[in-house]
Amino acid sequence: MDKKIDLEKNDKITVLQKYKAKKYFILHDQQSETHLYNVILDEFDKKIKAQTSDIGVLHTFYKPIPGEISHKYKKKLGDPKSEIHLYTSSPIYADAKNFVDIPLDKIDSIIVYKNDTGHEVLKVVGITAGTLVVVTAIIALTKSSCPFVYSNDGTIFYFEGELYPGAIRPTMERNDFFKLKHLKEKNNLYTIKVSNELKEIQYTNHLNLLEVLHPEDSEAMIDQNGKIHTVKNPISPFEISAENQLSDPKIVANSDNNSIHFNATSDNSEFQTLKLKFNRPQEKAKVKLILRLKNSYWLDYTFGKFYKKFGSSFNEFQKKNRNQPYEKSLKWMKEQGIPLEILIKNNEEWTLVESLNMVGPLAFRDIVVPIDLKSNSSKPLEIMLRCGFMFWEVDKIAADFSENSSVIVNNLQPFRAIDQNGNDVLKSLTQKDNQYLVQPNIGDHVYVSFKSNPEEIKEGKKTVFLENSGYYEYIRNFSGNANKLELMTFRNPGTFAKFSEKMYYEFISGEKALEELAIFDVAK
């Protein structure tokens, strides 16, 4: 008897996790379709490595077409097969041993298919090629991060980012803000999805939308403290230098996923630096630094290797530090170069003006950093970014000296919140209090709707931001004894950054470490 999976009652991620041994990659190029197995992501050379074979008979029931919302099966299937389809307009050739390298910039889109009410196949958004975002669909279940957020554009849900990144214990809970780029209202409602797709217990305290009405000739941005700013005349730096070595400013001129990775060779510096020079207009007392950035997957990997050193004592360590004061946690993170520090130069001295919280590795965020220049007379304007080795990626940098325009901000509380079991969980999300929405399992999810402002916009445009707070805790089952002597060295400032750099050079000098990043051991 055929078994059908109703995704109205069973979250797609839950189904995917249940059948993870059957994850199945199919490559579509100009010439043919091919099964990929033993798939490895090489983030540093920006390519996918795999072996190839003919597509199995259980995966030939339909031929997917990029761009369509859904496709019908030609016949009934049994257990759902989670398929990941890679599309490229360029031919991809395997070598004599059926090994293939696929550059990420050759991938036009990724589409994931799963059973939908037993007879349809659901399309998950195609992803722009040439970016590390391509990896999202592949590594989602291997990373250590936070709740995933998807926004509805009126038709489908798009991945937007992660809630409260880096808040790994209750005392680290904080407000977090980011733009929902794809969110559109339908029937006067905004709808988002928040899901647990990782080995974590996630505690979401509150969700709130900030609907911002601003002038047509401006872009609305938000700083990490939740203040809205407008951007009108951004300018790029005319000079950038990584570890005092000049680089091409064009690298950070556009939102093109051609990023600074903070991995320059250095013999002296404890942390990596990127120095910027901007032309400074006359008599400007304020500037808004505009950054498009994210944390690196390498930082995730480094944390994973660090936590593994605790062995079977990790859960005891996590429990012991659950109530560690926030100030102590923040001090350690700053000493290890985990936040991205923003410094400004004045009279040959650098002064710290902001430390940016983690934003997660899966999606770039647009962040604005307001900087007061009243006591700064330097020309040109010099700014420095500083962090640990390969902890951040910065795609675009600009400065805007314009005054903030007047904006109208509508705070929208949740109107409806229904979890994966059909339960009403609205009360857990409306206020920042001690009532949390707890998502302990992979596949737990909630659909949250907000009533949009009913007033008609006569001029200007809307931008919507998500305000959120909460924390999460890892679920790990490491084995072996803790390496106590080595772990004690991580109390020293800079040790975690040095650990990252050491691992990286070991990683690129041999294949053993690369194999540890194998995404799926896909059954042939």
Indicate residue ranges for each PLM-predicted region.
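Short beta-strand-plus-loop segments that form exposed binding edges in beta-rich domains
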Residues: 384-392
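A generic structural signal for beta-strand entry/edge sites
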Residues: 45-49, 99, 286, 366, ...
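Hydrophobic loop/turn residues within beta-sheet-rich immunoglobulin-like superfamily modules
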Residues: 39, 374-376, 388
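Activation corresponds to long, low-complexity, non-globular regions
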Residues: 135-378, 392-524
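Residue-level detector of beta-strand face positions
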Residues: 24-26, 341-343, 384
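Compositionally biased alpha-helical segments
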Residues: 1-242
